[in-house]
Amino acid sequence: MDPSEKKISVWICQEEKLVSGLSRRTTCSDVVRVLLEDGCRRRCRQRRGQRRGLTEDPSGQLELPEPPDENDEDDDDAMPPGMLCGPPQCYCIVEKWRGFERILPNKTRILRLWTAWGDEQENVRFVLVRSEASLPNAGPRSAEARVVLSRERPCLARGAPARPSLALTQEKQRRVVRKAFRKLAKLNRRRQQQPSSPCSSTSSSTASSCSSSARTHESASVERMETLVHLVLSQDHTIRQQVQRLRELDREIDRYEAKVHLDRMRRHGVNYVQDTYLVGAGIDLDGQTPEGEPEDATLEEKGTEPAAPLDSEAQAAALEELARRCDDLVRLQEERAQQEELLERLSAEIQEELNQRWMQRRNEELAAREESLEPDGGPDGELLLEQERVRTQLSTSLYIGLRLSTDLEAVKADLDYSQQQRDIKERELQGLLQSLHTFEQTVVHDGALGSSGPSREPQPQTCAEMWVDQARGLAKSCPGNDEDSDTGLSSMHSQDSDSVPPVCESLV
């Protein structure tokens, strides 16, 4: 169904028809008329084939071919060729898309509609059905079984509309459709091959009226059966589209779940599920108090136990706020990168424009100088030559100055960025030093508490003190302190070392 080839496909029952030669003025009524004419030609060809297949017995009577067996459930070619019978006004084209359908008006430009679908053309089907087998309104609707009311027995419409097709399996539905096709073919065959006996002179008007009424009743039955068959096939198309749509939605859900899982793995780690379930267990384990602790610590922990849920809620709120700020930060970084890229592109364009202007001006000056030197070659020409040379040097110096100014601006920007990074590193270093100072005080406090305990405990405290002394010595002997003396880091190191008493003195 390529729109460049001016052709579309229309489904008739379970057969796909390709309608070619469309133009921008082709309407749905034109397509219906062409399909009905094709059906009439097929019926005529089959009728001629049936006439050629008639055999004459010795008694001189014509013998019709044997009708198909009604109990043959596996006959797939039971669709009658005379399925489309009636005027074009009795048929319409239904547009089906992802389980939704609507009736197309007769004046709809079908090629324009098909082109407007764009990428969704593979999910669109045009189905030719009888007008009685579709809804009266032309709006979109979901697939739902519709009961065709009988005009002869209106009492069946009093009860609730039954939907037995939903309870049947796919094989049973296929058998029902085949049986309906065979029955409709049988009715059409009887109507087409009914022997036309010559009217005798003694035939009355009563006999002719009875035959006409029987023929009318038979045609009404055929139309009703055809309507039911079209309805079943239309619902079959709709159900297939709905099943395909459900599979697409399942695939989209799987892709989204995999994306969310990978996102969480990158954000919270591979074992984020276990960590989430073990958060409560970790809080419970931290809330347990050992037996050898003093009673004051136990009472203090008991007093903080009821506030644990509040802490967890506050932690969750803080995590949400942190996630929101991280998203804002990422968005700002993306905008900053875009602005920087735009700035670089504009700078390159400006520089290129300046170069072109300078070269153009230089060429014009050279051309003017050549023209001025041609008339006279005396002292005036030498003065003009010297003037042009000085002017050329001035323009060159101006160009070089512009380039140096541009480079200077770039260097200033890099210097500002480096200054910002240095400030950030300095703040981080101050935070680490503060943490180290706090840790030293904690170690000193633990050593003071451990001095009153058994004599076997000072050995681990001495190891901790040695580690702290080594850390302090590394902090003081850092070679970067001399370079950063203007920032006050060396004075801060000296203040820290002076303010904190040695660990050995505290132990003594």
From Swiss-Prot:
UniProt KW keywords: Coiled coil, Cytoplasm, Cytoskeleton, Neurogenesis
Tissue specificity note: Expressed in neural progenitor cells (at protein level).
Biased composition, class Polar residues, residue ranges: 487-498
Cellular component GO terms, alphabetical: centrosome; cytosol; spindle pole
GO annotation terms (biological process): nervous system development; positive regulation of neural precursor cell proliferation; positive regulation of neurogenesis; signal transduction
InterPro entries on file: N-RASSF (IPR033593), RA_dom (IPR000159), RASSF10_RA (IPR033634), RASSF8/10_RA (IPR048945), Ubiquitin-like_domsf (IPR029071)
Location of the region described as Disordered in the Swiss-Prot/TrEMBL record: 51-81, 186-221, 473-508
Biased composition (Low complexity): 195-214
Domain of life: Eukaryota
Domain Ras-associating: 1-133
Biased composition (Acidic residues): 66-78
Subcellular location(s) of the protein: Cytoplasm, Cytosol; Cytoplasm, Cytoskeleton, Microtubule organizing center, Centrosome; Cytoplasm, Cytoskeleton, Spindle pole
Disulfide bonds: none
A Pfam family matched in the record: RASSF8-10_RA
Residue stretches in coiled coil: 235-266, 319-358
PANTHER family registered for this protein in UniProt: RAS ASSOCIATION DOMAIN-CONTAINING PROTEIN 10, RAS-ASSOCIATING DOMAIN CONTAINING PROTEIN
Function text: Plays an important role in regulating embryonic neurogenesis.
Name of the molecule in the record: Ras association domain-containing protein 10
